Curated annotation (Swiss-Prot):
The active site is at residue 379. HAMAP family: GlmU. Mg(2+) binds at residues 119, 244. This is Bifunctional protein GlmU. UDP-N-acetyl-alpha-D-glucosamine binds at residues 21-24, 35, 88, 93-94, 117-119, 156, 171, 186, 244, 349, 367, 382, 393. The lineage of its organism: Bacteria, Bacillati, Actinomycetota, Actinomycetes, Micrococcales.
Length: 493
């Protein structure tokens, strides 16, 4: 068969096992972080592969690990608690990795084994379903994906006969000049019948310069045994693009982000500048959301219908309500209510909850705070470890002093409270419903409902202080001249 793979969205089948190869060292990444754990659109590379295996509906998912084992296992176990973990032994090679991987499968498993690489993040479940379907319909022993590349350098070439049938995989180092001109390459995605795979792996040796057990040798073993092999090209080579260095990681991130953005645009989201907008795979946006330039919507953030986010805004695992506006803001693990406004230059730290029609304005930092519906923190304030009721107003420059050097304490502000400018609320303290505080007040004691809390002494003007304390200075001379001069017109008003 020489036609391209038809991605037709075959239904899930529980008779599928997936083996994910995540044992490689990834030296070309030049990183302390294992290659398969490098982040891409909010998930590690291997996380994308695990998610695809889950969507495929595989009955068993096996991850083969070796280098930086503990780090990889921690992440895999968190993302896919039911995944089976198998350690590759000292025998290197992809063939050996699969050989140890299938030992985790039940002895009686007779379905299909799909082999994936942990560094191929864009491959989707629809493509795999179609690959498995083609494998079953043709009753193949092995069906593999291929891709046609403008630059196939470094990849194993697919050799076909005159009739277009698959004949072999030839690695670059073994290819003739004519074979090197072939642009169809092995994509490293395979479907085996379980029993055929078990028999084949036992026949693969390590008679090569690297003394490795190569999975690609399985094709030769099956062919010599008279088995059926089919190689199906994918229409979209990005689906099988592997990540080996940071250049490829950036290219994959750009491509995946473009696909994510296009999907949301087709779903009714306005994105003004896709080049400067980044959206993670787990983020969710409703129709009629507007995303302005320079915006990142990360993690499991959700943005409800009619909301506007940006410009220059970062949301991490943050919920934005309907018709809310969030501009030039950094928010993490926050909840922003419907029709609320945030920004510009606001910093919403974890635990911030802003009620419907509330406001967090310019140069405001919040943390672990619940702000009720219609309440406002308009500007230049720090509000931490606090509860603010509904329809209250926090004056400019307010500081909620929540830390005594040892422990954090909470501040409670009731409904319809008006805090004066430059207040310091020293927690723990309560400001009662309907109360006011004077400008510049340092509130250390509870303010009863309906009261006015003040802590600033009455103003006293010390006439002549500048001349007495700073004689001969320009300020003193100017003060004397002003005192001796004509009265200010404003004083007669």
């Amino acid at each position: 068969m020489t036609g391209e793979l038809d991605v037709d969205g075959e239904p899930r089948s529980p008779s599928i096992a997936v083996v994910i190869l995540a044992a490689g060292q990834g030296t070309r990444m030049r990183s302390r972080l294992p290659k398969v754990l490098h982040p891409l659109a909010g998930l590690p590379l291997v996380g994308h592969v695990l998610a695809t295996a889950e969507e495929l509906g595989a009955r068993h998912v096996v991850t083969v690990v070796r280098h930086d084992r503990d780090q990889v296992v921690d992440v895999v176990s968190r993302l896919a608690p039911d995944a089976l973990i198998v350690d590759q032994d000292e025998i290197p090679g992809t063939g050996r990795a699969v050989e140890v991987g299938i030992t985790a499968l039940p002895d009686g498993f007779t379905g299909q084994v799909v082999v994936l690489s942990g560094d191929v993040p864009l491959l989707d479940a629809a493509t795999l379903r179609s690959l498995v379907s083609a494998h079953r319909q043709a009753r193949n022993d092995l069906t593999l994906l291929t891709a046609r590349l403008d630059d196939p350098t470094g990849n194993g070439r697919i050799i076909r006969g005159q009739d277009g049938a698959f004949e072999a995989i030839v690695e670059q180092k073994d290819a003739t000049g004519e074979q090197l001109r072939i642009d169809e390459v092995n994509a490293g995605v395979y479907v085996f019948d379980a029993e055929a795979l078990r028999q084949t792996l036992g026949a693969i040796g390590t008679d090569n310069a690297q003394r490795e057990k190569y999975l690609t040798d399985a094709a030769d073993v099956i062919r010599r045994a008279g088995g059926s092999i089919e190689a199906l090209p994918v229409r979209d080579s990005w689906l099988v693009a592997g990540i080996n260095d940071r250049v490829q990681l950036t290219a994959a991130a750009t491509e995946l982000n473009a696909r994510i953005i296009r999907r949301w645009q087709l779903a009714g989201v306005t994105i003004h500048d896709p080049r400067t907008t980044w959206i993670d795979v787990k983020a969710t946006l409703a129709a009629d959301v507007t995303v302005l330039p320079g915006t990142q919507i990360l993690g499991a953030s959700t943005v409800a219908a009619g909301a506007t986010v940006g410009p220059d805004t970062t949301l991490r695992d943050t919920e934005v309500g309907e018709d809310a506006t969030v501009r030039r803001t950094d928010a993490e693990l926050a909840v922003i209510g419907a029709r609320a406004t945030v920004g510009p230059f606001s910093f919403l730290r974890p635990g911030t909850r802003l009620g419907d029609e509330g406001k967090i304005g310019a140069y405001v930092e919040t943390k672990n705070v619940e702000i009720g519906a219609g309440s406002k923190v308009p500007h230049l304030s720090y509000v931490g470890d606090a509860t603010i009721g509904e329809h209250s107003n926090v004056g400019a420059g307010a500081v909620f002093a929540n830390y005594d050097g040892v422990s954090k304490h909470r501040t409670e502000v009731g409904d319809h409270v008006h805090l004066g400018s430059r207040n310091v609320l020293v927690a723990p303290v309560r400001i009662g419903t309907g109360s006011y505080t004077g400008a510049g007040a340092v509130i250390r004691k509870d303010v009863p409902p309906g009261a006015l809390g003040i802590s600033v002494a009455p103003q006293r003007n010390m006439v002549g202080w500048t001349e007495a304390k700073r004689p001969g200075t320009p300020e003193a001379r100017a003060a004397v001249e002003a005192a001796d001069g004509p009265a200010d017109d404003a004083s007669d008003a």
